[in-house]
Amino acid sequence: MKSNTKIATAIVASFVLGGGTVSVLHAQAKLPAYAFVEIDVKDQDGYTKDFLPKAQANIKEGGGKYIAGGFNKAISMSGSPPPTRVVLLQFPDMDMLKAFNVKQRQLEAELGSKYASFRGVAVEGVEQK
């Protein structure tokens, strides 16, 4: 009888500890981060041939991926009309997005500003329940 009690206690303890471990691991998981970028392209040919391949390489190297957007794919829901290019990017977490942004700002200043003006906003995702 005593050994059955010990086994039952061990089983209950393992469930309690296991559930606590899952909660801790879940709480430590980083949330994805998103970049919403508005681009007013002045020279689409130059932008597409010269700047865009380098920007796409930066996104990939930075761990990002395209979620939505492109040339003339956005519509205005209210307020001013959208610029010629709007892009939504996803990154594994805000730290990776920030690291990407440092490199991307440099590329935009050195090359992209010849062809377009940029406005970007970063936002952290929310936990899905």
Regions found by a protein language model. Name each.
Residues 18-98, 124-129:
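Short S/T/G/P-rich N-terminal loop/turn motif that feeds into the first structured element of a domain
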Residues 1-11:
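Bacterial N-terminal signal peptides that target proteins for export
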Residues 113-129:
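C-terminal end-helix/capping segment
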